[in-house]
């Protein structure tokens, strides 16, 4: 959304969401395959101040495993954009920040 006066706004536009590659990720057999297995949280974007026309986003990718034997996990991905509208994922969707091993002090969601 864009506004010059903070009173009149442009129409809403989705600029980032789970896509076909996210939804095609393999999940354990115990999961209900009729629902998406990923959600994105903390999708705040920022303009990188030391380069012209560079925006960064670090959304948390929350993976739903659905059954107790498969813990829900969350990784942070890195996205870049030149205009704040069209986003590219860095590292072929590999986590930019990954959770620690099970049982470690960094294994929790937050």
Predicted regions and their residues:
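Carbohydrate-active catalytic/glycan-binding domains of CAZyme proteins
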Residues: 1-110
């Amino acid at each position: 959304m864009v506004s010059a006066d903070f009173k009149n706004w442009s129409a809403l536009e989705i600029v980032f969401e789970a896509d076909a590659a996210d939804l095609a990720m393999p999940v354990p057999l115990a999961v209900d395959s009729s629902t998406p297995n990923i959600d994105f949280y903390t999708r705040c974007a920022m303009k990188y101040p030391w380069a012209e026309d560079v925006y960064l986003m670090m959304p948390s990718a929350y993976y739903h495993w659905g059954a107790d034997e498969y813990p829900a996990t969350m990784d942070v991905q890195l996205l870049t954009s030149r205009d704040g509208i069209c986003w590219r994922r860095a590292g072929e969707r590999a986590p930019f920040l990954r959770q620690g091993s099970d049982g470690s002090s960094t294994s929790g969601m937050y």
